[in-house]
Amino acid sequence: MAEQLSPGKTTDQVCTFLFKKPGRKVAAGRRKRPICNQESGDSSSSSDEGNTVVRPEKKRAVHNPMIQKTRGSGKQKVAYGDLSSEEEEENKSESLGVVYKSTRSAKPVGPEDMGATAVYELDTEKERDAQAIFERSQKIQEELRGQEDDKIYRGINNYQKFMKPKDTSMGNASSGMVRKGPIRAPEHLRATVRWDYQPDICKDYKETGFCGFGDSCKFLHDRSDYKHGWQIERELDEGRYGVYEDENYEVGSDEEEIPFKCFICRQTFQNPVVTKCRHYFCESCALQHFRTTPRCYVCDQQTNGVFNPAKELIAKLEKHRAAEGGGASGFPEDPDEDPVPIT
């Protein structure tokens, strides 16, 4: 290297030093320049000598949770013919996403008794509950019966008893199952639930108040109204539950049903009459309106010219006039108008 280059030597003998810069992480995903392109650029004059085979390089896998793909190594090996027969069989088995292995048995999965002998473990342990304490106490009492007191403390539940409890009408006191206090729950519990949507109310009695079966009818004789659970849930969802409760149980009086003014003239009744649709008018107002149309002034139903005397309203008016003569009038009237004479 220290020798000087003669002018006859070519520039190909000059040695150049290349320093590779450390690549940044950002450039890891960039496409690398294939080596064959550099070789082809150096020997551009000898491009006609032969064909070059370009094989794509395997890219470096970058961990990115947003990019997911299937395994493709087997496909690449098959494409280049580098896959052996053993690897082909392994890839065939791995190509299936889910593989189930049959047990070759017709029995259901799980316990053979389908959980009928499962132990209920939410209560106190069987060896520590009240029934176990009572049974141990009974056993100790049997051992100590007929013996003298040995002055040995055996616990608060194991004091020596000199009188044996007798059976009563409530049951056997020594069995422990009829005593006061907690009773041992069954260990093996299987619940059978039946949803009964039938109200079991006698339909004939509810609609008509009469049933041909009488007291022998097995259904309930009740004429009150009930709502099923799904009806209450629907009202809760729609926001209508309990809105009209006061109106449903409100008892209306007769005075509220009978008006105190004529619907046509808006004045106090003069010879009141009532139609078939239970609307009250003055006799003159009803006849005058009938000349225009035979329909009711309030509900627009056909009256057919039938106007009956309003006996109930006349009795109310007489009652209020009598009360007014005594100094107490509860009938609402205009103060400027005189009492209506009933003819």
Swiss-Prot record:
Segments for region (Disordered): 23-95, 323-343
Gene Ontology terms: cellular component: nuclear speck; nucleus; U2-type precatalytic spliceosome; U2-type spliceosomal complex
Domain of life: Eukaryota
Pathway: Protein modification; protein ubiquitination
Residue ranges covered by zinc fingers (C3H1-type): 196-224
Low complexity compositional bias, start-end: 39-50
Zinc finger region(s), RING-type: 262-300
Biased composition (Acidic residues): 333-343
Primary localisation category: nucleus
Start-end of Basic residues biased regions: 23-34
Annotated GO biological process: DNA repair; mRNA splicing, via spliceosome; negative regulation of chemokine-mediated signaling pathway; protein ubiquitination; snoRNA splicing
Region span, Important for interaction with CXCR4: 50-61
Region (Important for interaction with SNRNP200/BRR2): 2-60
SUPFAM superfamilies: CCCH zinc finger, RING/U-box
Enzyme class label: transferase
GO MF term set: ubiquitin protein ligase activity; zinc ion binding
Localization, UniProt: Nucleus; Nucleus speckle
Residue(s) carrying Phosphoserine: S6, S84, S85, S253
A Pfam family: zf-C3HC4_3
The protein's Enzyme Commission number: 2.3.2.27
PANTHER family: RING FINGER PROTEIN 113B, ZINC FINGER PROTEIN 183
Summary of subunit composition and partner proteins: Component of pre-catalytic and catalytic spliceosome complexes. Interacts (via N-terminus) with the spliceosome subunit SNRNP200/BRR2. Component of the minor spliceosome. Within this complex, interacts with SCNM1 and CRIPT.
Protein name per Swiss-Prot or TrEMBL: E3 ubiquitin-protein ligase RNF113A
Organism annotation: Bos taurus
Gene field: RNF113A
